[in-house]
């Protein structure tokens, strides 16, 4: 099963993806984690990515698609992928569809975690205090959220038109959101 966890920064995508990895043996393909790893490597690419993320902007489609494509064989071997933070644009979604189709696969379901903006801001402040991620700086977060809303919003009709979009309340506890996700995945896993 290939699924996309969709939602704004701090919606809980990473938390839920990690749980699904543990419980279902899927591979989490988190562009955020991949980009942070590139930065930590100190490579030229990592330095370019750092500058973009520090400004709260989105990394180019070309870079993100290449990172995902490199990890698809690993996901295929595990029997499925959780795409976390990808795709972010319609161009990325179309590229993902093509990459998966070339492997005889597809996206099975898109789960959108809906969280109110004030709750997102509180979550990001808490995460910034606890983890100190530069891209969680409250000022940078406002830019990230605006970029998400402007560039990612067109993906909703893209996946809704394919009958793959399921919207879930992401405002509850980690456990409540997990239960909603599990319920949404039951018919997909059975089908």
Curated annotation (Swiss-Prot):
Keywords from the named record: ATP-binding, Cytoplasm, Kinase, Nucleotide biosynthesis, Nucleotide-binding, Transferase
Biochemical pathway: Purine metabolism; AMP biosynthesis via salvage pathway; AMP from ADP: step 1/1
The keyword Secreted is assigned to this record: no
Gene behind this protein: adk
Residues that coordinate or bind AMP: 31, 36, 57-59, 85-88, 92, 133, 144
Any single biological process term in GO: AMP salvage
Localization of this protein: Cytoplasm
Source organism, top-level taxon: Bacteria
Organism: Caulobacter vibrioides (strain NA1000 / CB15N) (Caulobacter crescentus)
Name of the protein in question: Adenylate kinase
Residues noted as binding ATP in the record, renumbered to the chain: 10-15, 127, 172
Main localization of the protein described in the UniProt heading: cytoplasm
GO cellular-component term (any): cytoplasm
NCBIfam families: PRK00279.1-3, PRK14527.1, PRK14531.1, PRK14532.1
Oligomer and partners: Monomer.
Annotated signal sequence range: none
This protein's record includes keyword Transferase: yes
Entry-linked InterPro entries: Adenylat/UMP-CMP_kin, Adenylat_kinase_CS, P-loop_NTPase
EC number: 2.7.4.3
SUPFAM superfamilies xrefs: P-loop containing nucleoside triphosphate hydrolases
Alphabetical list of HAMAP family matching this protein: Adenylate_kinase_Adk (MF_00235)
Role noted for this protein: Catalyzes the reversible transfer of the terminal phosphate group between ATP and AMP. Plays an important role in cellular energy homeostasis and in adenine nucleotide metabolism.
Catalytic activity from the UniProt record: AMP + ATP = 2 ADP
């Amino acid at each position: 099963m290939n699924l996309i966890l969709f939602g704004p920064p701090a919606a809980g995508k990473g938390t839920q993806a990690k749980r699904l990895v543990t419980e279902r043996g899927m591979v989490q393909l988190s562009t955020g984690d991949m980009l942070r790893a590139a930065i930590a490597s100190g490579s030229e690419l990592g330095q370019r990515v750092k500058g973009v993320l520090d400004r709260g902007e989105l990394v180019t489609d070309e870079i993100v698609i290449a990172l995902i494509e490199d990890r698809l064989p690993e996901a295929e071997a595990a029997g499925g992928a959780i795409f976390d933070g990808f795709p972010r644009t319609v161009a990325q979604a179309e590229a993902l569809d093509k990459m998966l189709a070339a492997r005889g696969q597809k996206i099975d379901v898109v789960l959108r975690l809906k969280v109110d903006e004030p709750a997102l801001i509180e979550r990001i402040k808490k995460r910034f205090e606890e983890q100190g991620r530069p891209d969680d700086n409250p000022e940078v977060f406002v830019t990230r959220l605006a970029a998400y809303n402007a560039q990612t919003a067109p993906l909703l009709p893209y996946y809704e038109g394919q009958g793959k979009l399921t919207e879930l309340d992401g405002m509850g506890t980690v456990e409540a959101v997990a239960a909603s996700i599990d319920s949404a995945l039951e018919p997909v896993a059975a089908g």
